[in-house]
């Protein structure tokens, strides 16, 4: 089994999620050295898979011989025809549709993103506020894509935030299966139920086969 995976992100929330999901498998999770000073990859893909794969390939060149995993994730709201989608990280940016492509890890404020979703869902009844979190992980080594892994979590978008444990859209995303928002989950619960946890389990299965 591959015992070490480097995660291409400077987002501490994502690193916590990965570490929590990997702990039961005995997999060491690390960040890329000096990642914060690395120029961001331009995310110009039309799908989560496109963006995750591109990031993994480019960032894996920074750590020769290592398995590097990058993710692209976001929220799809059915009443908004799948938005924010691949634009989730910067949905509140005023120039969202005026400047393409955009750079990874230059996210606008989470609260502003949430506020835009709430504004666009104003008046939408609860039964039509369905949506899902999507996470795609891409693994690469030495600039070559190895595989991708998709995880999803179905839920309901609330009309006000709840909880303080999460990041991004977590406070708005209500998960009926356990009666909590993702921002109310413990690290263990999030590893079990989240879209990122689902994708990571597929990654772990791939590691086991390797």
Regions found by a protein language model. Give the residues of each.
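Anionic-ligand binding patches
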Residues: 2-6, 12-210
């Amino acid at each position: 089994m591959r015992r070490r995976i480097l995660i291409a992100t400077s987002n501490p929330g994502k690193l916590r999620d990965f570490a929590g999901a990997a702990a039961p498998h005995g997999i060491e999770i690390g960040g890329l050295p000096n990642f914060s000073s690395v120029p961001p990859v331009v995310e110009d893909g039309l799908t989560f898979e496109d963006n995750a794969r591109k990031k993994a390939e480019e960032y894996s060149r920074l750590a020769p011989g290592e398995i590097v995993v990058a993710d692209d994730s976001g929220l799809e709201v059915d009443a908004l025809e799948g938005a924010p989608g691949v634009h989730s990280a910067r949905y509140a940016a005023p120039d969202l549709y005026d400047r393409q492509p955009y750079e990874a890890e230059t996210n606008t404020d989470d609260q502003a993103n949430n506020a835009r979703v709430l504004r666009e869902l104003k008046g939408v009844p609860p039964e039509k506020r369905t949506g899902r979190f999507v996470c795609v992980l891409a693994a690469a080594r030495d600039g070559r894509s190895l595989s991708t892994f998709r995880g999803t979590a179905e839920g309901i978008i609330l009309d006000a935030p709840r909880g303080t444990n999460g990041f991004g859209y977590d406070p708005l995303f209500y998960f009926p299966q356990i009666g909590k928002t993702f921002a109310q989950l413990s690290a263990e619960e999030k590893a079990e139920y989240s879209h990122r946890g689902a994708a990571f389990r597929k990654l772990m299965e791939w590691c086991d086969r390797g």
